[in-house]
Each structure stands twice: as C-alpha cells, then as structure tokens.
Amino acid sequence: MGSSRAPWMGRVGGHGMMALLLAGLLLPGTLAKSIGTFSDPCKDPMRITSPNDPCLTGKGDSSGFSSYSGSSSSGSSISSARSSGGGSSGSSSGSSIAQGGSAGSFKPGTGYSQVSYSSGSGSSLQGASGSSQLGSSSSHSGSSGSHSGSSSSHSSSSSSFQFSSSSFQVGNGSALPTNDNSYRGILNPSQPGQSSSSSQTFGVSSSGQSVSSNQRPCSSDIPDSPCSGGPIVSHSGPYIPSSHSVSGGQRPVVVVVDQHGSGAPGVVQGPPCSNGGLPGKPCPPITSVDKSYGGYEVVGGSSDSYLVPGMTYSKGKIYPVGYFTKENPVKGSPGVPSFAAGPPISEGKYFSSNPIIPSQSAASSAIAFQPVGTGGVQLCGGGSTGSKGPCSPSSSRVPSSSSISSSSGLPYHPCGSASQSPCSPPGTGSFSSSSSSQSSGKIILQPCGSKSSSSGHPCMSVSSLTLTGGPDGSPHPDPSAGAKPCGSSSAGKIPCRSIRDILAQVKPLGPQLADPEVFLPQGELLDSP
C-alpha cells in the first residue's frame, strides 16, 4: 500500500513543485506589480513628493497609480477602483470624479482618483478626460438646467459655478483618500453663470457648485484654458472676480476639507470632526501639518471680504492653497502630487512670488494675484525687448482706468494687447498707490521677500493698504499691520513683515502656527518685531 502510494504522492509532489515554479515565474509579473507598489518607494501611495524627488525627475520608476471611474446608467452610483497600470499621462485619473461604492464613502487604498465636493440643488460633478465620464449624457442635474458632456455645458442658474474649458484644471491622478465613512472634498468656487455638470450630486451647502475636470492639449489661441501642459486657472465666484487666477504652470488653487454628516440630506454619514465643528458642516481648519508634509499652515477666516495671495475663498471662508488635514495627510503618486498646490514649498516663497493685482467686483472689493513668471504678471527686463509688463488677464474685464498704475504712471493693460510694456521701471520697484484709493475698495498687500528693487521686482509701497477686518468683516486700511517700506535695505532684500504677520492682524482669523518661518522665502531671516 505504501508502494502504491509513493508514485501518487510523487506525482502530486511533482505537480506541486511545477505549480510553485510557475507561480514563481508569474508572480513577478502580476502580483509583484501590486506588491511592488508598496515595496518600491516611488510607487508608495503614502509617499510625499518634492520638487527634486527622483521619482519626478526621471531617476526612479515613473509608473504610478491610475484609476478609473465606473458609471451606472443613472449616474447615481460612481465607484472607484485602483489600477497599477501606466504612467499618469494617459490615464483617466485626476479627471475622474469618484464616489466610493453605494455608501458614498472613500476608503484608503480603494483608489487614487480625484475626489471632488459639490453641493446644493442643481450642482454636480463631471470628470471628462476623453476616456471617462461620470454619469450618462442623458441624465440631468436637478434644476440647474445643465447636461453632462465632455466639455462645458451651460446652466441657467446664476448661483452655480463653472469649472470647465476656461476655468479649472485638476491635476492628473490627484488622490484624496480619506478615512472610512467620510469623504474628502474640494471646494472650488468658479465663474458664475455656467455649469459643466453631470447628474452626480452630493454635499451639504445650499449654493450650487459644479466641478469639471477637463484635460486637453494646450492651445495658444485660448490663453486662459486649462490644459495638460500647464494650466491657467481662473478662480472666481460671487465675491472673487474673474481676474483672480493662477498661471504660469501653477497647479490649481483648491481647498480641501473633510465633510462629515449627521442626518443632513445628501450628506455622507461619518464621524465628527476631530477638532470640533457642527455636524454636517465642513470641519474647521486643522492648525497645521507636520513639517515633513511641507510645513503648510491653515490660516482661516470667516469674512468673505478679503483674500490674500496663496489663499482661496469658498462658502464665506478663506483657506490657504494646499489645505489638507492631519488625519489624512497629503499623499501622492509618482509624478502626480495629490495636493493642489504642487510639491511642498514654503508658503512665504509662494506668497512673495505673487504680486497682487487689485480689482473690483460688483459686490465688494477683491484681491487678485498672479505669479511672476511665464504667464500672469511679468516684469519688464532692463532694456530687454519683448518682455511683458505687469498686466491683467484679458478675461478679467478690469478697465485700465481702475487698475493699479505703475510708478511710471502707466496703467495695466490686458495681457496680449498692443500695450505690453507698462511696468515698474528698474530701480523703482514699487507700485504707485495713487490709483489705489480706499474709496475704490482696492486692497494691496506688500509681498515679502522681494529681491532688490534694482532688478525690477515689484513690492508694494509703504502707503499700501494692509488689512484688518471691520465689525462687518470688511477690509479696512490698517497702518499698524506692520508692513515696512520697500527698498530700504542695502543687502538687496526687502525688509518687510511676513505675510503671516500681516494676516495675524486680520480679524477674524483661524488658528495660527507658532512658526512663521514656513511663510518666509527660503534663506531669508525673520525680522525681529
């Protein structure tokens, strides 16, 4: 019996060994792709990317997470799943809005697709990258009178917002996974009067917000359109005028908050905010995140009457670019950081590179800004030809008579117009405040860290209006905010208070971080008070 059993065991053992050998050959090509995602640091979804990250500079494996969104026939249940295929260039992630499962919750590890927040009657979400859409084209979103499509569609509701062809670009492959029973949202108020939407709606607030993520090649004849090669992001709403934009390849200005629900209609049920807050409402801003995540600080505010560089406005609150929570810190996939402000940078450096273009909306005063660089505000070079001066985007509709004048007395002109050279001449480096009267409601802040005035970099004059909140939350000039004169240093630095010090004078304010150095440009010392 033993002799008859041995060959059978041998055959089984042989088959078993063969199976093991085959598995050993197949595993590296199949399971290793998913296992390697976490063994390879470049594929680790918990990895934090930085500007000189070898995974971004081509020294590491650039393949990362892409995700797909499934769409039901009614567009009411959109699920997200993770796929380890391909790089980010051809994937649909980032331009897909995903809702995890029928319970409406996002779970870490289930997918790394863009998660957006929308709320109110007639508001909806659309992800249109040419390869994946949320919802079917035959479904309509409530009372907004809009239909879904791969590009923008129009809405008759004046309270809805547009994030479509000329408005907002969501980074490809952005990821915002959250804890169980809650979802991470992106609040993006944009231009009123239009809505690019499908039928996927959920959220808390009452004003319609629509988010569309359109990715397409850049076009020179559409200067303000978002594109895959470096978007120009327009950001406006009931308060912020259309001249508020970020360009020059900057990532979109977005606000990320955790949403929790407790019985409100259409709200995902979830745990209460870790730092307080009303049920069913956005959690209050977290004070800060670890320095390893870029040292971002949340400087909150409850007034809708002011905005400063690097901050964005949504639903009556002001948040900084790149806002995220400590419980769900920023995550990224190779080549595609998940937070909207781009790789971790000093907030002070970001602020100082964004001169402010005051403009005025119909309702109240506003601050608009663009970064110095390719697109946006540019400075005239000394004697160089073809350099554009400071200008406002052609879509801003800000008349030159009401915009800031340079120290030479020449007003700003729309970018691309015949007059492209008005700028602050080298050696002056300050804007004239003559056209920035208080009566016009314009607000000017002094960007700290500007280099020497001889290089033509702008800084605001000592008479510029710094902010303080009035009883009604409206901005008022406050000389005590601490801005110092520009150009008073012989070392080529502009001694001025950091943006955090200025913000500290603005009331009401949210939590403050005790380390203002994260708001200073790299290599610059903090002024002693």
Curated annotation (Swiss-Prot):
Residues 449-467 have a biased composition (Polar residues). Its main location: secreted. Residues 1-32 form the signal peptide. The keyword Cytoplasm does not apply. Disulfide bonds: none annotated. It comes from the Eukaryota. Glycans are attached at N172. The keyword Transcription does not apply. GO terms for biological process: cell-cell adhesion; skin morphogenesis. It is found in: Secreted. Residues 58-83, 90-100, 111-175, 189-231, 392-408, 426-441 have a biased composition (Low complexity). Keywords: Glycoprotein, Secreted, Signal. Residues 38-248, 383-492 are annotated as: Disordered. GO terms for molecular function: protein homodimerization activity. This is Corneodesmosin. It comes from Pan troglodytes. The lineage of its organism: Eukaryota, Metazoa, Chordata, Craniata, Vertebrata. The gene is CDSN.
